[in-house]
Amino acid sequence: MPDFKPSLILYTADALNDRGEAVLAQFPDAERLEVKQHNRLPELGMNHFKVKSDVLVLGKLKTRDVKWSGRSADYIAPSLANGCFGGCTYCYVDRHKNVNPITLFTNVEENMATIDQHVQALSWPKPTNQTDATYWTYDIGCNSDISIDYNLTEGIQQVFEFYCDHPRAKATFATKFVNRDLLDFDPKRKVRIRFSLMPSHVSKLVDVRTDSIEKRIAAINDFYDAGYEVHVNFSPVIVYSGPDGDRKAWRNDYRELFRQLDTALRPEVRAQLKAEVIFLTHNQWQHQANLAINPKAEELLWVPELQESKVSQFGGWNIRYAHQLKSKMVEVFKGLVQEEIPWCEIRYIF
């Protein structure tokens, strides 16, 4: 876990409620600058990683839409934050901003009221599906890493408490960090944490400034013991050859990863653990940016002979593995799971 201590805090006037003021008080030595909009920042004169290390933004989330997912959760909750300390080379959040520091939204009560109103309008009991057998699930961390945000504002714990006490709703988020402060909270199995996993040597290259795969795997038993439901997120799956041209290198590395997972987890933890699997989608703008800041990663991410292009819903040019090849890759991955960790149910894979 990084020790995030911003030297500059940008804030909008409407973000300075009691929670916003508490965040400012947490970092008394930071320079403060009021801005008109949290998502239109002035020129900061810092590079990509410096902004993530040194800048924090406080804002008020005005558009609190709840969006259907059907994959990681039933619904995507309004964002509690946007941006991350990490610098993952494939992150879709970074695609839409020139710089992307952590932005905390301080109107947490309005967020929870939106969720309560939304879930109360849904059918009950909930129809059983792959997201959860009992509760309507909401992904609370699609645009940030909640493990980092948790230490920056008490609002995240308040959100955890809201879901723990709610008779119909359950929270979930994916993370690439191990924040052991979360172990002091009792989530009553109403918060599902999903540790993102990939082969360790690949993670070191593309999961920039995040906790190691070894740390993430080692934390799974502990988070289960603390009362969390724990799943894993094999995402993104990156297909690559070895230095010697071995096209099965990615398969062999995932086999080793699965064996590490099988060895590390206790039987009762395995029994409740499920996985989601998402193969890589990359972006042309991000590819160009990475060539300047992390060109080695692009040797894995940008492989035109394996990929096809598509236009995203935002009008960007994305690439993904070619359809026929990907169908085979999916079957290979499912086969590896069945061979090495047959106890791990795949919730969805694409």
Predicted segments with their positions:
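Conserved radical SAM core fold
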Residues: 143-148, 178-182, 191-210, 236-244, ...
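Conserved Radical SAM active-site core
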Residues: 57-72, 93-196
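Local cysteine-cluster metal-coordination motifs and their immediate loop/turn environment
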Residues: 79-96
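Well-ordered, non-membrane alpha-helical segments in soluble/globular domains
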Residues: 17-20, 108-118, 153-159, 210-219, ...
